[in-house]
Amino acid sequence: MKYIMTAAALALGAGSAVQAADDVTLQLKWVTQAQFAGYYVAQDKGFYEEEDLNVTILPGGPDIAPTQVIAGGGADVTVEWMPAALAAREKGLPLVNIAQPFKSSGMMLTCWKDTGISEPADLANRTLGVWFFGNEFPFMSWMSQLGISTEGKSENGVEVLKQGFNVDPLLQRQADCISTMTYNEYWQVIDAGVSEDELITFKYEDQGVATLEDGLYVLEDNLEDPEFVDKMQRFVRASMKGWKYAEENPDEAAEIVLDNDASGAQTETHQQRMMREIAKLTSGSDGALDPADYQRTVDTLLTGGSSPVITKEPEGAWTHVITDAALK
């Protein structure tokens, strides 16, 4: 591929001066996996190149905070979940959502069925594994709506276990339920030898407390630069082309992700399965943020119990300026 691109560049250079492509650096929220397939597909298929962009994709990880990377100038645009982005904005980092490739949330609570849990009301007096670092707020809002305290086990309370990013608390019966994503941790439980019939799941989307997940965020000041805006319009257009290709060609998309996994930690089976689940979350979006989804996210965060992730209605936290031009 590199040879072909070099040859093409030489051919162009023979007749006229070649204008350099515009550089864009994208910071991912997590490690290289099918959760970010659309961007890798856009790069692999030449969609970014067609938009005259030279895109560098930076994987995330447990020691990488996307908001800190973009704040420090290490990226032009970052993939982040809206709760973290809005929290950062309230604390002084002016992040703005410019596109929302994920329409639906993949977060859910996965429980052992033999505990007798069959509906949300049954969660009282149980131990529940919950992710923190901003991921706990949809859960706290849900418990608040159910009238269930999170201060400890009781007839109307639950014990909250701070869960790491693994499924051990469920497998080891330290918790009756744990936090999982439809495309990742749930399948780790299944791969550990648990039957789907042994489990019951509660999707946050179904409970009305889902918050928006993978969106594209930039710093507000950059949106005052017409050249940056133009660059982001081209980036979003190419990225959404990549996402739609990935939805329609999940196995090929998974292979492209694996080709970009420098760690070698991912497997074909897991990535193909993940891509199929991710496609369910992106299929309802053309890239433009739905204001109703944004408002639901804000309302959920503002009712997240005694210590909400945001304390007031945000202002200027999203824009359609990029998608209006990119998707027309």
Please report, for each region that a protein language model flagged, where it lies by residue.
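Short, surface-exposed acidic
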Residues: 150-158, 196-200, 225, 229, ...
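Short, glycine-/small- and polar/acidic-enriched structural segments
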Residues: 23-163, 169-172, 176-183, 204, ...
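Sec-exported extracytoplasmic/periplasmic mature domains
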Residues: 44, 71, 90, 144-148, ...
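Secondary-structure end/capping motifs
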Residues: 224-305
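Sec/Tat signal peptide C-region and signal peptidase I cleavage site
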Residues: 15-21
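Conserved C-terminal helix/tail region of periplasmic/extracytoplasmic solute-binding proteins
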Residues: 294-328
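Bacterial N-terminal signal peptides
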Residues: 5-15
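Periplasmic-binding protein-like
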Residues: 101-111, 195-224, 276-278, 316, ...
